Amino acid sequence: FPTRRSSDLEFLYRLRFKSLSGWIGYAHSNFMREIDLNSDGVIWEERENYPAKYNKPQSFMAVFSYKLNNKYNLGMTCVYESGQTYTAVIGKVHQAGQQNFHSLEKPYDYFGNIYGKRNGSSYPNYIRVDLNVSRKSKLFGLPGAFKVQIINVMNYYNVLLYNWNHDASPSKVEAYSMFPRVITFGW
């Protein structure tokens, strides 16, 4: 069975002034996994001791709400996190067991990935700022609030995953983002 080690330091501060409320949080953490993959009773430091997938050493979040008057509220959320860990592809190799050679048109058909150290790389840092405005109102006699929100105001490209294309020579990597700037509204 795998064992896990973690160390963590967290800070949370709640704000409460006249019209401004919210909180600020910071966490510094380290999560490691240790597993005997080949069941030989020996842990190989370079392959069987690695950062957990959810290891994000730095995490900062701030949430603010400002009450303009009895009807209108402004809100802001700021997030900064270290990038999530992943196992990087460091090369490609022909998988001779499947077929010796496919064709001259597609010579890279039976290539597979050569992986680096398990969870030894990190995606770029995750940065996001959201803004919102809400107005108290009634809809069909029911109390509520109409809200407009801009998610990812800075339109920062937060990488969700990498996709490796071995059909190209040299191999190409393409990054996929979570979402661009999005404007939402609702009641």
Question: PLM ranges: what are they?
Answer:
Residues 4-86:
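Gram-negative outer-membrane beta-barrel transporters
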Residues 79-109, 123-130, 134-187:
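C-terminal beta-signal and adjacent terminal beta-strands/loops
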Residues 55-59, 68, 116, 128-131, ...:
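Short amphipathic alpha-helical surface micro-motifs
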Residues 4, 45-51, 116-120, 170-175:
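Extracellular loop and loop/strand-boundary signature of outer-membrane beta-barrel proteins
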Residues 16-18, 53-56, 67, 71, ...:
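Context-gated lysine
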